[in-house]
Amino acid sequence: MAQQTGILGIRGTVGGLVFRKDGSISQKPASNRAAFQSAPGLARTRENAAEFGLSAKYSKLLRDSLRVAIASASDSRLASRLTKAMREVIGLDDTNDRGQRVFDSSNSAPLLGFNFNAGAGIGQTMYFPYEVTGAGADVTMTIPALNPVSDIAAPQGTTHFELVFAASSLDMEMLTFTNAVVAAPLGILPVNSPALVNQTLVASFPAAPADANLVVGVVGINFYQQVNGKFYPLNNNSTNPLAIEYVA
């Protein structure tokens, strides 16, 4: 705000002019945002910023869609790591110009194997065979055999485990999602349970997802310690792995 410093003296900004203490006058500079949007030398920066912003939106959408599963298996850098992965997918768009590239589900392969908890890997925890496939409105996980005693590397103090399986369908244009429902999960089981054979878990959507949607299936495991009939998450969930094992 301009201030009058004498009979004729003015210091500050009036309209588009800046009056300085030494008596000099200059035009008010354009805002940083306006300069950023128009400067030719910042074209590449604007393009990168646009695609980074879109990647962040995609990352949040996926995290929101899997919020329940992620709540027990994530790390402090999940948002930035997933945004980086989404940025990689956007970079595979060979149709739109730089700065206008978008997510194409046909380029979603870089998301396969993404680990939501960097401190706990699927490959170092789950040693039993399984397969995740999709058809129509269903994403299915099949487990030929699972012996909890030998096939799960449970951290010390674990008494029970819970196999996590979830799926979501994401509309990357409208930024909306639909969650599938697993009708018959295995539930929480003792780590010394008898071996399981030929198990099938089915995550069903209300209807088959649109072809353009990103469909994601995640697999993980939660560890618990039972005390007086109650199940307590082990190590504040820091040892629970969760990874994307299906994309379409």
Per-range role (PLM):
Residues M1-A120:
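Long, polar/Ser/Thr-enriched low-complexity segments
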Residues R33, L42-R44, A50-G53, T83-M86, ...:
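Glycine-rich loops and low-complexity Gly/Arg-rich segments
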Residues I90-N236:
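Charged linear interaction tracts used for macromolecular binding and regulation
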Residues P233-V247:
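Low-complexity, polybasic segments enriched for Lys interleaved with small residues
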